[in-house]
Amino acid sequence: LVCFGDSITAQDWPDYLTLRCAREGFNNVSIIRRAVSGTRILREYSCITYAAYGLKGATRFPIEMNVAGARSVIVQHGINDIIHPVGVEVNKFRPWSDMPTADDLINGVRSLYVTHARKLSLKIYSGTLLPIYGWRTYNENRDIIRMAFNEWLRTAPEFDGCVDFDKAVRGHDDPKRFANNFDSGDHLHPSAKAYEAMAESVPEELLK
């Protein structure tokens, strides 16, 4: 089972998923992480300042899905496409023209990830994007894009299923925010407790 994404996947939920597999006796699955912090679906940076953010998803995905024995992939990707653009007057490398619509993200995932996963005979599961309320570039428009994209991720027939990470970590009274004790403090990345909840939200069918 390949876990594909950005900094959220580069951190702890795949580790907690591995621990869960050991604890619950899912002994016929390996959890493989393929994650790069800062990476986006649709674009990559051409400047050395953000070189560590790596390649865009269109380039990464075909390379990183070459995993011997892989049967399924969970894709949790796209939040950086939404939160990075701030305008050239703030950061010359992050123009507003980089801001995607929800349809841009949907078409990107459909054409770049779903299509290639099918070529490799992989089952592909969507992972919803987590709350961002309070993040330093948060605004209502960004959250509207996130929520519209999430709704598609939950319902799109192109996927074999959805891992609703957003539902696992969001607040019950205010779903735009992390639940209590689930925010690492920057309002973007989850706490250790939240990463554990994300791992617990992965359906058993992916682990058998």
Feature names for model-found ranges:
Residues 1-108, 135-138, 189:
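Conserved SGNH/GDSL esterase-like catalytic core that processes O-acyl groups on lipids
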Residues 9, 18, 22-23, 66, ...:
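Sec-exported extracytoplasmic/periplasmic mature domains
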Residues 15, 19, 59, 63, ...:
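Solvent-exposed, polar/charged alpha-helical surfaces in well-ordered, non-transmembrane soluble domains
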Residues 30, 121-123, 161:
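Proline-centered loop/turn at the N-terminus of a beta-strand
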Residues 32-34, 127, 165:
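Short glycine/serine/threonine-enriched helix-capping/active-site loop
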Residues 61-64, 68-71, 109-116, 160-168:
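Phosphate-binding glycine-rich loops and adjacent basic patches that engage nucleotide phosphates
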Residues 76-81, 112-147:
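Active-site segments of SGNH/GDSL-like serine hydrolases
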Residues 129-208:
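Catalytic His-Asp segment of secreted/periplasmic serine-dependent ester chemistry enzymes
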